[in-house]
Amino acid sequence: MAISAEELEKILKKSFPSSVIKITDLVGDQDHYALEISDAQFNGLSLINQHKLVKNALSEILNKKLHSISIKTISIP
């Protein structure tokens, strides 16, 4: 149950192609990540809805290849 940061970014880029993504492997096991993603899709959305977009993009791997993820979303013009 692990996924590389590169694979994680590829999955996110499918839903957020113009985003700026920063991924940090928190403990070096490819299973616990901190994610910072900046995208115009977040403009006008509540924080909860921004996080829902990210979680929907990751739905194929959540609870399968990813144990823990901390999400920080940033809306950009």
UniProtKB/Swiss-Prot annotation:
Q: Name one Pfam family in it.
A: BolA
Q: Which InterPro entries match?
A: BolA (IPR002634), BolA-like_sf (IPR036065)
Q: What is this protein called?
A: Uncharacterized protein RP812
Organism expressing this protein natively: Rickettsia prowazekii (strain Madrid E)
